[in-house]
Amino acid sequence: MQKKLVVEKVEKRDERLWLICDHPPFSLEQARPKNHMLVDSDNIAFIYILETDEDFIYVAIPSEFWMDIKQVLTDGTPIFLQSGTIEMELTHFKEELTYLIENIDGNANYGEQMEQAVKEIFLT
């Protein structure tokens, strides 16, 4: 089964970049990073995958927060998720995001809107 969280805001504190979901519809108590990201071309978002023994949890990062996460690529700031009271590092985020950006550039399979959004934020 698959569950989904949508990042509501981003904050930089304690030398970390925090993706925040203030009111998650479920607990992430048993969740752990899967070290993998996907693209949601329909909603123009990057997806970081968490997993439990029974579920995959998609953490959607809408394009409105991409300028914030762009700094992760340049300065290596660790990126963390705060969902309710649960906090965890999103490991391999930089590597996965870099791979996706390189793959999307010039690739029509992701859709024109997604490709354009990635170019505007990450490739200019």
UniProtKB/Swiss-Prot annotation:
<dbReference type="InterPro" id="IPR020908">
    <property type="entry name" value="UPF0738"/>
</dbReference>
<comment type="similarity">
    <text>Belongs to the UPF0738 family.</text>
</comment>
<dbReference type="Pfam" id="PF19785">
    <property type="entry name" value="UPF0738"/>
</dbReference>
<protein>
    <recommendedName>
        <fullName>UPF0738 protein GWCH70_0774</fullName>
    </recommendedName>
</protein>
